Amino acid sequence: MAFPAPAFSLANLLNGSYGVDTPEDVERLRSEQREEAAAACRNYRPLPAVDVSESVSEDAHSLQTPDGAPAEAVSDEFVTYGAEDYLEKSDDELLVAFETMVKPMRIGQLWCPAFNKCSFISSIAMARALLLAPRTSHRTMKCFEDLVAAIYTKSDFYYSEECEADDIQMDISSRDVPGYSFEPWSRTSGFEPPPICEACDMIMYQCPCFDFNALKKSCAERTFADDYVIEGLDGVVDNATLLSNLGPFLVPVKCQYEKCPTPTIAIPPNLNRATDRVDINLVQSICDSTLPTHSNYDDSFHQVFVESADYSIDLDHVRLRQSDLIAKIPDSGHMIPVLNTGSGHKRVGTTKEVLTAIKKRNADVPELGDSVNLSRLSKAVAERFFISYINGNSLASSNFVNVVSNFHDYMEKWKSSGLSYDDLPDLHAENLQFYDHMIKSDVKPVVSDTLNIDRPVPATITYHKKSITSQFSPLFTALFERFQRCLRERIILPVGKISSLEMAGFDVKSKYCLEIDLSKFDKSQGEFHLLIQEHILNGLGCPAPITKWWCDFHRFSYIRDRRAGVGMPISFQRRTGDAFTYFGNTIVTMAEFAWCYDTDQFEKLLFSGDDSLGFSLLPPVGDPSKFTTLYNMEAKVMEPSVPYICSKFLLSDEFGNTFSVPDPLREVQRLGTKKIPYSDNDEFLFAHFMSFVDRLKFLDRMSQSCIDQLSIFFELKYKKSGEEAALMLGAFKKYTANFQSYKELYYSDRRQCELINSFCSTEFRVERVNSNKLRKKYGIERRCDDKRRTPTGSYGGGEEAETKVSQTKSTGTRSQKSQRESAFKSQTVPLPTVLSSGWSGTDRVVPPRERGGVTRA
């Protein structure tokens, strides 16, 4: 089928339809070449018999198979004979050699042609073999580097007749054209290194002394070849790329250049930041487009609304004790984020907040499972667990060690918190069924667009005291290390020193993924799950008396929140803060997965707590309904499944190695966190910065291929634009560069508050009044031993004054009254106020910011 050529016009030239190889043109050219090759084979005539040494030619066009000749299949295997020295080189050295020999063209982060390790080494081996073979052709073969590039790109091995090596050195230099000078042509990659600052030795658009706006003056005269983007390519196309695409069609075109207007600089160069490419407004626009319900979210007074409104809840067996509550939590203030990403304030564990969290996290246990024989089925599930995951020989030969050393490490870790060997209790004398309870003050970021209709509920923690946990944690830590050493090779638990999400030699591309989302995981566990854990712990080598003892005080427990005055009984559900939480959740998830799916069909299986992820070459086959009918879990098979586990995406680089990338959506939300305490030397902010840098250490491994993978996975998981994920990576690169850039994201209004609270007025008169009614009205009464600052009036804007109160202990009502009166006399109460505006009065109390000032004692 013939495709008509587009008509020549400036519009077709600009939109890329004239002079640019479109997919249709490429297919047309390839079909014509195939037809010519087939015609050449049909018209083949055998040559007369002559001497082989004189007639055999190495021309690529003469090496065609005649009709009727035995055709041998060409092997595409990895050819390495003659290139053993390159097999010993590292990947970085091969990349340098690839750039030197093949000289690929760079378009942003994309190489053309792309790098392939096997093809590159095979090309080197074939080039060496061709150079050593006897030459019978009259044409000149290319030099070694150009020959490797020709083999890699599947082009001609010989120089063309017009541009042979001898002519390039002789004819061009001998030409005498007035006004022109000719030099030998050399292949360039098109890569321009970034400018380096001489002062701080950093990339100039990352250093503080770089003035990006000043460079705009040198770019006043521009053409469409400098800034115009051809469809199908990303980034700015330079002159070399444009000429290579348009070719000779640019010759008859007469372009008239006109000077562009002077760019308007909105921000003076001396006030500009380190870079103009990523700024705070761009990051906020990404948040607004990706999380539309988060941009206007402000929960500053949400908990106040909850505490002051009517409250109704339905709970069974709840005990409330409101006599010894902690009314206020000391807080020195927090840093205020510049970005509005939907992050909430810290939650205070009040009675209503704790009851709401218990209702969601601990109460209302679902009953979705069927009636089964618990003892028989739990043994069968444990047996399937060992068959699917455990290497029996390794389990038999491994030892149960490091218990005592783990105990000493735990004691050293919490030594600063006051834990010592003398404080360790006798566990037989302790009631281990009593657990302390608290809520997490930090709420997990919400990635769904529901913040406008739903208020996130904090998670709960059920835990023993450190003196009790210190005696169980070393045992389970040593048992978990033994469990990891006995796992099969394809099973990965990404925790500890011997395992992580970094998988060398495993590529996640072209694999089927299976991700199971288990909801209400902790409170859905019952007696069946407890029996499964008991059999598995005994099989791993845990002493049977300890296993039996541990399971007994998990059958029925009592939790109590001392701060909120709330307590309630619970049964078999998971204790979210004891020494066995992570280990137990991982065992339960693995046992459920092995019963619902055949683990032999997966190449890799990853488990971490209630998260699971499997990779297979074929679509996974199993029965996920058993998660609900047998294990009482609300399970959801994620469709479409992507390599995502532990809030991280798994990506593969060009060398077939897999590494983890934190979820960009959650990382952007963390940039607007409101939990960083205020400090004068920014020590807490710097700690968050170092944590941010550690989480984003993967940025140096992000090539264009990895960015494309992340964009695709991001779109599949969140149904949002993948281009936003690439923009987030640019923001992460800026804010991990140095601490000064990271400080742009937060500020503190503490100095601003000091300016507001400090006021000076020339006409300001205060009268002290000794009145019992006013003393009760302003709440100034306090006890003799109270060292706290005297509370201010109802205006809330005045500055409190320190008052020294006699510490002499007195008895009787008369002595206490005299001390209260003396304390009141030293307090300054601004009652009648005369201002320059002429307003005065004593009938009401007006805030100082409305009157014009405050007073200090």
Curated annotation (Swiss-Prot):
Catalytic reaction(s) noted: RNA(n) + a ribonucleoside 5'-triphosphate = RNA(n+1) + diphosphate
The keyword Nucleotidyltransferase is annotated on this UniProt entry: yes
Main EC class the enzyme belongs to: transferase
PROSITE patterns cross-referenced by the UniProt entry: RDRP_SSRNA_POS
Sequence ranges assigned to domain RdRp catalytic in this UniProt record: 511-624
Bias type Polar residues, positions: 804-816, 824-840
Region of interest (Disordered), residue spans: 785-857
Biased composition (Basic and acidic residues): 846-857
Listed InterPro entries: Bromoviridae_RdRp (IPR047309), DNA/RNA_pol_sf (IPR043502), RNA-dep_RNA_pol_alsuvir (IPR001788), RNA-dir_pol_PSvirus (IPR007094)
GO biological process: DNA-templated transcription; positive stranded viral RNA replication
Keyword RNA-binding in record: no
Name of one Pfam family that matches: RdRP_2
Gene Ontology molecular function terms on file: nucleotide binding; RNA binding; RNA-directed RNA polymerase activity
EC numbers: 2.7.7.48
Subunit-structure text: Interacts with replication protein 1a.
Function, as annotated: RNA-dependent RNA polymerase which replicates the viral genome composed of 3 RNA segments, RNA1, RNA2 and RNA3.
Protein name per Swiss-Prot or TrEMBL: RNA-directed RNA polymerase 2a
Species the sequence originates in: Cucumber mosaic virus (strain Iizuka)
Organism classification: Viruses, Riboviria, Orthornavirae, Kitrinoviricota, Alsuviricetes
